[in-house]
């Protein structure tokens, strides 16, 4: 301590304070470095009661004192010189020696003697030591306020001690980060140093305890956050004036406490977040279990019969047994025997099972029935009929006039339950699906209405679904050909020929169909059906190439899907033949729903259409649907024939062999090697060769067009 006094005398002018702290630093390294920090905090109270006239000296003294605990980046060299020893004293071997020093300096908080008092003596010319006893005028008032601040600071220290105890559990790496953080507070305001130096005493003590104990590894390093928050607050406080020292110190302490409280609350809030995944799993399990309980929407299991009726608008205020009894009584009054009644879980709807289809049809005809004051709604269950059942009672009508309406079709098909016209972009495609109530009604209509004329056009009827695949032309879709077809396909027919003309030629024919264009004229072909395969074969042998109205007809037995050479493998592309020369690719594409591209094959020399083309689709399903809809349809007045196009790579001619080798160049020397075959044209021979090398083999990829070389 004597050396410290000498250093104070050698300082003289307050502005030249740099050298003495270095001496103090060197001496303190040999002694106990943490003792300086404790003396500094106690020496603050000696410097504060100075007069305003001596403010410069007091400030410089503070700079010397604060430097051991903080690495302040102010131009004063004394701070930088005194930082390292303070850190070493707090971090390494000084732990054990600092402990007794604490007992010495603790009462020195109000005694105001060592450390800082000795350093500040030259600035005050000896007035700093008895400053505590000389309470006069303004200085006395400041002393009183300082004592109050000490009380406040002691309360703050208690809060800080709680924080420091938490910091004891931080890992070594976190301890280093926490020690480096206050060292980075280079621009701390001098106003904060009064309270902070007092806090440093407690922090040093807590750090010493922390270094002697093993840190808890499980503790999170997130506790270092308060230091960063404090740095921000202290950087903002630097902009405050020196005259507001006391107020700023109090506010900083309060802010630090508030931040600590907020951080503790945040940590408490973080804990439930960790538990969230577990809770979510439980909730997810509950959510998954919930739908299973709701699957049973209708009381009872499966329908007892195949004849079911949906009953809606029930009085849900009644119980399920009451509703069952009420519904059964209503149908019993109308002479309808009910097999079973199933009520929905909401009791707003239900299903009634009948013994027969006749009872079901009678029930559907009933109107105005009331059950417990509610007029019930009766209809067939939606989705109950399978596609197979609907197809069995549905007919496909083709070659319809484009301007035909549903009302006009209803007049023709009186027994139809539903009529659906097929259109694209608001324009009719001349096709309609006609659904009947029963399969028997569909079969009856098929026999009676086949070939019926509507606005001058003879319509064609086809079954849909599996039933349509097992019938010949009269059913629209032809059966898988067995080799014994009863139908002949007649082509190259005169456009003026009629069904009556053909009936005279084919006397044994049971059905004759001559498709017509929009003008009511023949399209140049016909279908002739006989009672047996033998009759059809006899007509084929006797009438093939016979002239009818000036044209020699051609006959052939109808094969699968209307063509003897039909392709059996579906694909994404349809082959369309029988096109008009005026048909464009755009028209061809628009004629098929779902098509993505269409191309018409043209003659290379004339550029005119060859009468056939291809239509591409995104999937085989789209191609099948379009083929079904356009089977035996028309495009620009011409009857077209559809077939599956073979995928690229199937059949066809094999690729050419490799090109021949190039010729040798002029002049002497050796010729280069010939080109390799299979990839385009052959290569050139090298210059000066007698002859070119041989061409490649012919087992490579097909070669492109030949190219002649001069």
From Swiss-Prot:
Q: What is its main location?
A: nucleus
Where, per UniProt, does this protein localize? Answer: Nucleus, Nucleolus; Cytoplasm
**Which sites are covalently linked via Glycyl lysine isopeptide (Lys-Gly) (interchain with G-Cter in SUMO2)?**
297, 324, 370, 377, 513, 577, 589, 624
Q: Which InterPro entries match?
A: Nucleolin_RRM1, Nucleolin_RRM2, Nucleolin_RRM3, Nucleolin_RRM4, Nucleotide-bd_a/b_plait_sf, RBD_domain_sf, RRM_dom, RRM_dom_euk
As annotated, the Glycyl lysine isopeptide (Lys-Gly) (interchain with G-Cter in SUMO1) covalent link is placed at 297, 324, 589
Q: Which residues are annotated as modified residue Phosphothreonine in the UniProt record?
A: 69, 76, 84, 92, 99, 106, 113, 121, 214, 301, 367, 405
Provide the record's note on post-translational modification: Some glutamate residues are glycylated by TTLL8. This modification occurs exclusively on glutamate residues and results in a glycine chain on the gamma-carboxyl group. Symmetrically methylated by PRMT5.
Q: Which UniProt keywords apply?
A: Acetylation, Cytoplasm, DNA-binding, Isopeptide bond, Methylation, Nucleus, Phosphoprotein, Repeat, RNA-binding, Ubl conjugation
Q: Which residues carry this modification: Phosphoserine?
A: 28, 34, 41-42, 67, 145, 153, 184, 206, 356, 458, 460, 563, 580, 591, 619
Q: Domain of life here?
A: Eukaryota
GO process terms (BP)? angiogenesis; cellular response to epidermal growth factor stimulus; cellular response to leukemia inhibitory factor; negative regulation of insulin receptor signaling pathway; negative regulation of translation; positive regulation of mRNA splicing, via spliceosome; positive regulation of transcription by RNA polymerase II; positive regulation of transcription of nucleolar large rRNA by RNA polymerase I
Which Gene Ontology cellular component terms are annotated?
cell cortex; chromosome; cornified envelope; cytoplasmic ribonucleoprotein granule; extracellular exosome; macropinosome membrane; membrane; nucleolus
According to its UniProt entry, the function of this protein is described as:
Nucleolin is the major nucleolar protein of growing eukaryotic cells. It is found associated with intranucleolar chromatin and pre-ribosomal particles. It induces chromatin decondensation by binding to histone H1. It is thought to play a role in pre-rRNA transcription and ribosome assembly. May play a role in the process of transcriptional elongation. Binds RNA oligonucleotides with 5'-UUAGGG-3' repeats more tightly than the telomeric single-stranded DNA 5'-TTAGGG-3' repeats.
Protein name according to UniProt: Nucleolin
Species whose genome carries this gene: Homo sapiens
**The organism's lineage?**
Eukaryota, Metazoa, Chordata, Craniata, Vertebrata
